[in-house]
Amino acid sequence: MYTSSDLKTWHYDGLALNKNNTNIPRFFWAPEVYKVGQKYIMYFSGNEHLYVAEANSPKGPFKQVGNAPMLQEKAIDSSIFYSLSGKPYIVFVRMNDGNNVWVAPLREDMYNIDTTSMKHCFSVSQEWEKAQARVNEGPCVFTRHKKYYMIYSANDFRSPFYGLGMAESLLPEGPWTKWEDNPFLQKPDTLVGVGHNSFFKDAKGRMRIVFHAHASAHRVQPRYMYIGTLKFYRRGGKEHVKVVDIIQPTTE
């Protein structure tokens, strides 16, 4: 867990989820924390399955809820959003067609997926997504102007062509339409392998985007975190987006 007062310099605040508070042996990634009532819930991937942990503070300590994953099959990269009517949904990645994106309602307890209502959002389809491996992953959804927008990553994360695309829908369960001018972020300036983003609104109400990129043009690891600002604009009668003011945070 890291905290910051300016988004530029971050301070280490200890482990949010300790291995002693989970039964998962390996492959921890993609945690997202949400305040639900008086609890903080972490949705994360572990050993290529979806899990939930909870805590009384956003800093933890988080403890795994139950012993079983949210789905019995392999799945990764979960993210939560609420419909315009306030219903909670989860987007995630199944591995039944390469890596492809699905959406489903969450049950009222926020810990379980309504598996009877799972919907396929999309698989690899656009040419830019076919540079390496069959991968659509890292989805996250936000609402804007009464529409749903989903940002996702495509290509293998080790590829320099790993990048971000946008899709939109009028309904939380889809159908989803990918933007024709994807990717909106791929190889910006000297960065390569950019992807698996999340987003938040800063103190000024600006939509900020967080993503990771390769260590360099010649080395994947360790991947570094970057923060930018999402700018929407219209051109040719269509909506477009770009990422501006990219910074690389530092740690103390």
What are these regions (language model features)?
Residues 1-252:
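Carbohydrate-active catalytic/glycan-binding domains of CAZyme proteins
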